[in-house]
Every structure is written in structure tokens, then in C-alpha cells.
Design a protein with these regions (language model features):
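Disordered, acidic Ser/Thr/Pro-rich linker "stalks" and the adjacent N-terminal cap
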Residues: 2, 30-140, 183, 194-230
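Cleavable N-terminal signal peptides of Sec/SRP-targeted secreted and luminal proteins
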Residues: 9-34
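Hydrophobic/aromatic beta-strand segments within beta-rich folds
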Residues: 64, 132-152, 162, 195-268, ...
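Intrinsically disordered, low-complexity linkers and tails
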Residues: 242-253, 258-313, 322-348
Length: 348
């Protein structure tokens, strides 16, 4: 057991270090002076300030698509214990049974003691030879993303990758965001633990930090978007990092499964114990409004479709407040910063 189980101290340190990184990024992407609820300091709206929507889990209740989900047809799976034994705790996945189904949308639903749900892929008994599994989440609009955290019910993958799209254009190519692997160079042709250079801050890194088979359940995979980026403390003046955190859709590729090596013997119950299962996906961030809105709301388009948009202030317009209103183009549009709200000015 000692071969594959991390020490308790190491697990606690990883959790603690993640919380420290997360706290730093929340303070950085937010406003240290608390100016996020209003776009003006005064009731007369004469003192504009940078404003932002509240920090949220951008993935919550968003639709998820997967190329591989158990239950069609119903299939049996077994709980991984780490011990090869002819007797395993097994049950069924059945997409037509509300109590036995595990669809992809279960990774973004509400989680509590009364709603212990998860998504699950087919087992190695069905997905054999193994083919990578993909999950895609459409956020519905661009967000400034601070972190992504995935909590697994199964052992974490040996290799997985996160990709993103910046815009809502479905034809936009996927951009690599982060790689996780015990074999970074072999699997992704990326050297592990690289240092980001100031000249290229939009580069996906690879780490083996979350690729151990232990714990067998409840393990997290976490990624903070600005960690290790040279200009992370000068975000207002870094267009490269502003684009790097901008995310409208996320793709998770589960490329290699962690096993104990016993699958090579072909035992059916052993193969039934290997699959991917995710309890929860959290995408921490703010609705992207470029510092010109304190809220985002769904608006109905003439077509009847609902669209998430910023409620723009400072005489700005657009889904992300990314432009000036007509007749307010006395100077070029600009993002609001902590020091300057960069209000669009009238020509008259």
C-alpha cells in the first residue's frame, strides 16, 4: 500500500498550498479595496470606478457534453479498492434509471448530502481498447477565470489535459490550458515543470502533482490560471494575461487511466473497476465585463434565445462591455483599471 499512497502530510500540504495560491489570485483578480458592487462612488454617478461582477463558480448548472458515459446499455461497474480480489463491491449504471444514471451534467449540479451525484464513463471492460474520454463545458459567455478544480470519485487520471476557448465562436480552435501527467514529455511532448518566460506567457504547462493513483476516491486536480506567470502582479498592463484568463468554454481530455497493472490479466471484475468518475467541476471566476459592469444578466434575443450579457456602465456597450456606446467615442475604448475607470466620453 505504501507504494502508491501519498502520505497524509503531503496531501495536507497540497491542499494548503492550493488554498494559498487561490487566495492570492482571488485578491489579485478582484479589487483589494472592495470596489466591485458599484461602478460609481457616489449616487450622482459623477465618480466612476472600476467594477466587477461577483466571484462565482462559472460552471454551476452549465451544460456538459461527453463522448463517453456509462449506462447505454446498462452496465456493471465495481468499486476500486486497490486489492486484487475475486469479490468486489459492484453495482449497475443505467441511463434510464434516475437512481442509477450518471450523466455528464452531474459534474455541474448542486452538491449536498441529499444530492450525491457524479458523472461516470464506461469501464475498461466496455471501453477496450481504451479510447480517451472528453468532457466539454460551455460557459455561455466569456469569464475571467482564476482557477479550475476537478474532484474525482474514481482515481485521478495518469494523464489529462484542459483546453479552453476565448470567444463563444464554436469554430475557434481549442487552446491548451494545462497538462497533468506522470509522463509529460511522452504523452504531451511538454517538458515537466517548465518556467514561463516573460516573452511567452500564454503557454500551457505540465505537472505530475495530481497524477498519482492515490487517493482512490475524492482526489482533486487543480489549476490556477496565473500561477507562475511573470506579469501576474501587473495584470492591468498585460494584454497577454488578460486574454489568457478569458474563457468561454472548457474541454477536459482524460487521456490515460491510472491502474495497478492488473488489467493485463483480463479479469472481468478488475476491468469493471477501472473507469473515470467526476463528482464536481468548479470554475472560479467573474463574468468578463472589462471593469465596466457590476452584474451580468440573461437577456432574450429577437430569436428567442437567452444570452448572458454584462449590464454595462461607464457609457460602454457590448456583451462584455468591450466597446463605447455610439456618440461616446471621444477617446478610444479601454478596460477599467484600479486607478482609472476609463469612462467612454461623449463627443458633444
Amino acid at each position: 500500500m505504501e507504494v502508491y499512497c501519498c502520505s497524509r502530510a503531503k496531501r495536507h500540504w497540497r491542499r494548503f498550498s492550493f488554498l494559498l495560491r487561490l487566495l492570492a489570485l482571488l485578491m489579485f483578480l478582484g479589487t483589494a479595496d472592495g470596489q466591485t458592487r458599484s461602478c460609481y462612488r457616489d449616487r450622482d454617478r459623477k465618480l466612476p470606478v472600476r467594477c466587477m461582477p461577483e466571484f462565482e463558480n462559472a460552471a454551476y448548472s452549465k451544460p456538459v457534453e461527453s463522448n463517453n458515459t456509462c449506462g447505454i446499455p446498462p452496465s456493471e461497474f465495481c468499486v476500486q479498492t486497490g486489492v486484487t480480489s475475486p469479490t468486489k463491491e459492484c453495482t449497475f449504471c443505467n441511463a434510464s434509471d434516475p437512481l442509477l444514471r450518471h450523466p455528464a451534467d452531474y459534474i455541474t449540479d448542486i452538491k449536498n448530502d441529499q444530492n450525491r451525484t457524479w458523472w461516470q464513463s464506461e469501464t475498461l471492460l466496455v471501453n477496450n481498447p481504451f479510447k480517451p474520454v472528453t468532457l466539454t463545458i460551455d460557459l455561455g459567455k466569456s469569464y475571467d477565470v482564476s482557477y479550475i478544480r476537478i474532484r474525482f470519485r474514481s482515481p485521478r487520471p495518469e494523464s489529462m489535459a484542459i483546453y479552453k476557448r476565448t470567444s463563444t465562436d464554436p469554430k475557434e480552435p481549442w487552446t491548451p490550458y494545462q497538462y497533468f501527467s506522470d509522463s509529460c514529455k511522452k504523452t504531451y511532448n511538454v517538458e515537466p515543470m517548465q518556467i514561463v518566460s516573460p516573452e511567452n506567457q500564454q503557454v500551457a504547462l505540465c505537472t505530475d502533482e495530481f497524477s498519482s493513483i492515490s487517493p482512490l476516491t475524492g482526489g482533486n486536480v487543480a489549476f490556477t490560471t496565473l500561477e507562475g506567470r511573470p506579469d501576474n502582479l501587473n495584470f492591468d498592463n498585460s494584454p497577454a494575461l488578460q486574454e489568457w484568463v478569458t474563457t468561454s468554454a472548457i474541454r477536459i481530455d482524460l487521456d490515460k487511466m491510472n491502474t495497478f497493472g492488473d488489467e493485463v490479466f483480463g479479469d472481468a471484475n478488475v476491468l469493471r473497476s477501472y473507469y473515470f468518475a467526476i463528482i464536481d467541476l468548479a470554475v472560479g471566476g467573474r463574468c468578463k465585463c472589462n471593469g465596466h459592469a457590476a452584474n451580468c444578466e440573461k437577456k432574450q434575443l429577437p430569436s428567442g434565445k437567452m444570452e448572458l450579457r454584462c449590464i454595462c456602465q461607464h457609457n460602454t456597450a457590448g456583451v462584455d462591455c468591450q466597446e463605447c456606446k455610439p456618440l461616446y467615442n471621444d477617446r478610444p475604448w479601454a478596460r477599467a483599471t484600479k486607478d482609472n475607470a476609463n469612462v467612454c466620453r461623449s463627443k458633444f
